């Protein structure tokens, strides 16, 4: 998908609350985001699916904050990275509490 098309779809989601436009973005980026998580989770497909879902939920919730300072994919991957970082941090906290 071209960056121009991504911007158009983002605008439709923000201005018109067009969920079908967001569905198109999900279709385009679902596989790459899932592969990103598969690499980070050593192939754990269930966890990768959960993290990808969290990424798209956060992207939809915060799509109005997309400022087109970078490509939509860069913005989405930053969200994905943050979702993974939050997951790792929560796991460390759970492990730390279990050993207390």
Regions found by a protein language model. Give the residues of each.
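Sigma70-family region 2
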Residues: 15, 42-43, 56-71, 91-92
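Arg/Lys-rich amphipathic alpha helix in sigma70-family domain 2
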Residues: 65-67, 81-97
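Structural recognition of an alpha-helix C-terminal capping motif at a helix-to-coil junction
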Residues: 50-57, 70-82
